């Protein structure tokens, strides 16, 4: 390995800085004649990067109060427009949706998503449409979700028995670990016809840590993404960590592929998701899916399918434990509709308006993705009289929209009843009502929206109905701090002691009846 002399390194850095400044001056001169949205000035070269801090969604929300619902920031050498209100989000994600349907290049897509060969980061085009279509048909769509409802019910049966056993020895429940175990097994059964984790322990903890690390790293504002000329330096060490993490996931996915292929004879007549995808690698739409595409898709589904929904459930339980009257009110509704002689089942959900209101309130106050995955403008455009240059990144502050005092009364309070009022009762979280867009909206709305809503409502409802919850004796108060990432995690995981409230035999079977 050749080591460059320090003088050459210094000269290179100076050259890059001068080049960037010249390019910026040229660009600024051409845009100055046009009306960009307001925003902070930022620093030379690095722009507004230092202003974002460790909690970018919070920093951007504060800036929006000063500069307005549509802001323009120079982040490094890249332009970024931020939408912070429902109307602003609607303008970008509905009116200008097609112009903002691509993703900007970034290190996460390159180093962790097989060079954007997945569904999340793939360019808007035939391959993305095919991956989306196959995922909806065989896993994420309404009919597919019905087909694997028994998998969700059986896995929750395993979870309830484990929690019941823990309650009898006074063992505390670590909510995030419990949810990761259950949800990874649900997804594993649908995709691979197997529970990927048979027992809690080192293996599942390592997987959870990998998922959390991926979602955290993917949410970082990596300097190299915004100043491509110095990306090779990896000043924050982020790309090095991404490559190391990708190797772990690739080893895991390779192992899953090999085990799945070895058991193909056992699935004759009962194909799973991976079987369907492999059978449709060559298709009439002219796209051929490589093994890399399929690995990348499985990575999307495993990580997003476990981490995002589990974070919303954990936040909902946290808010309810801080507000016991909400917990009791939810249990009373369930006792009237379901009783205590059977388990909670998915078909109960439409009959439980207060539970659904709790879930919506959790999605509002604690969206799993505080900032939508960035999009980029394919062409220059105009919005509300503002000029948006080509190749401008778009960030929608979903967290800020959910806490907008012009939209929500007492937005910092957890009040499920707000969704039972005439004003908000018809607001849904499926991408059409821009006051509540936890999954985004438009063409690039989260492909797992339906699954995410079902998972949160069903699992949270089961946990509320099946147990009484309290804090461990050594915990005086609940920590409500956030940790920023692609998914908004609790800084301190929720731990609780549970007490069964149903008949003993209900906890002993994986079947819902």
From Swiss-Prot:
Heme binds at residue 446. It is an enzyme of class 1 (oxidoreductase). Pathway: Pigment biosynthesis; anthocyanin biosynthesis. Pfam families: p450. GO terms for biological process: anthocyanin-containing compound biosynthetic process. It comes from the Eukaryota. It catalyses: a 3',5'-unsubstituted flavanone + 2 reduced [NADPH--hemoprotein reductase] + 2 O2 = a 3',5'-dihydroxyflavanone + 2 oxidized [NADPH--hemoprotein reductase] + 2 H2O + 2 H(+). Hypocotyl tissues. Its EC number is 1.14.14.81. Keywords: Heme, Iron, Metal-binding, Monooxygenase, NADP, Oxidoreductase. GO terms for molecular function: flavonoid 3',5'-hydroxylase activity; heme binding; iron ion binding. CDD domains: CYP75. Gene3D superfamilies: Cytochrome P450 (1.10.630.10). Belongs to the cytochrome P450 family. Catalyzes the 3'5'-hydroxylation of naringenin and eriodictyol to form 5,7,3,'4',5'-pentahydroxyflavanone and 3',5'-hydroxylation of dihydrokaempferol and dihydroquercetin to form dihydromyricetin. This is Flavonoid 3',5'-hydroxylase. It comes from Solanum melongena. The lineage of its organism: Eukaryota, Viridiplantae, Streptophyta, Embryophyta, Tracheophyta. The gene is CYP75A2.
């Amino acid at each position: 390995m050749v080591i460059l002399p320090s003088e050459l390194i210094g000269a290179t850095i100076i050259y890059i800085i001068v080049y960037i400044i010249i390019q910026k001056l040229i660009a600024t001169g051409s845009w100055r004649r046009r009306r960009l949205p307001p925003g902070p000035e930022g620093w030379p070269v690095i722009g507004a990067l230092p202003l974002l801090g460790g909690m970018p969604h919070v920093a951007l929300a504060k800036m929006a109060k000063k500069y307005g619902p549509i802001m323009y920031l120079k982040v490094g050498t890249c332009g970024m427009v931020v939408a912070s209100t429902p109307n602003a989000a609607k303008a970008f994600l509905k009116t200008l949706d097609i112009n903002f349907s691509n993703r900007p290049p970034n290190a996460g897509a390159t180093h962790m998503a097989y060079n954007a060969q997945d569904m999340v980061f793939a360019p808007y085009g035939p391959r993305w449409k095919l991956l989306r279509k196959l995922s909806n048909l065989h896993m994420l769509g309404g009919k597919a979700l019905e087909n694997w409802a028994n998998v969700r019910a059986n896995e929750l049966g395993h979870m309830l028995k484990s929690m019941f056993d823990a309650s009898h020895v006074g063992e505390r429940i670590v909510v995030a670990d419990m949810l990761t175990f259950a949800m990874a097994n649900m997804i594993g059964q649908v995709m691979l016809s197997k529970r990927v984790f048979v027992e809690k322990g080192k293996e599942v903890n390592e997987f959870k840590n990998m998922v959390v690390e991926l979602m955290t790293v993917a949410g970082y504002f990596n300097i190299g993404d915004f100043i491509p000329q110095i990306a090779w330096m990896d000043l924050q060490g982020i790309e090095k960590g991404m490559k190391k993490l990708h190797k772990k996931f690739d080893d895991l996915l390779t192992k899953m592929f090999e085990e799945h292929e070895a058991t193909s004879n056992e699935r004759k007549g009962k194909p799973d998701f991976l079987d369907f995808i492999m059978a449709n690698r060559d298709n009439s739409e002219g796209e051929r899916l490589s093994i890399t595409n399929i690995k990348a898709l499985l990575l999307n589904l495993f990580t997003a399918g476990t981490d995002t929904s589990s974070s919303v459930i954990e936040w909902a339980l946290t808010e309810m434990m801080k507000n016991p009257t909400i917990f009791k009110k939810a249990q009373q509704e369930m006792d009237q509709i379901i009783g205590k002689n059977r388990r909670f089942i998915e078909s109960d959900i439409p009959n439980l308006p207060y539970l659904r209101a709790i879930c919506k309130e959790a999605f509002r106050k604690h969206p799993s993705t505080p900032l939508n995955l960035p999009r980029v403008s394919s062409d220059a455009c105009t919005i509300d009289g503002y000029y948006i240059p080509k190749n401008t990144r778009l960030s929608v502050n979903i967290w800020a929209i959910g806490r907008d005092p012009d939209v929500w009364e007492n937005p910092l309070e957890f009040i499920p009843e707000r969704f039972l009022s005439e004003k908000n009762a018809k607001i849904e979280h499926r991408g059409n009502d821009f006051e509540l867009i936890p999954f985004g909206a438009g063409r690039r709305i989260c492909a797992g929206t339906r699954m995410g809503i079902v998972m949160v409502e069903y699992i949270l409802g089961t946990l509320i109905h099946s147990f009484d919850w309290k804090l461990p004796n050594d915990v005086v108060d609940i920590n409500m701090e956030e940790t920023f990432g692609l998914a908004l995690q609790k800084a301190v995981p929720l731990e609780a002691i549970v007490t069964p409230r149903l008949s003993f035999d209900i906890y002993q079977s994986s079947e819902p009846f």
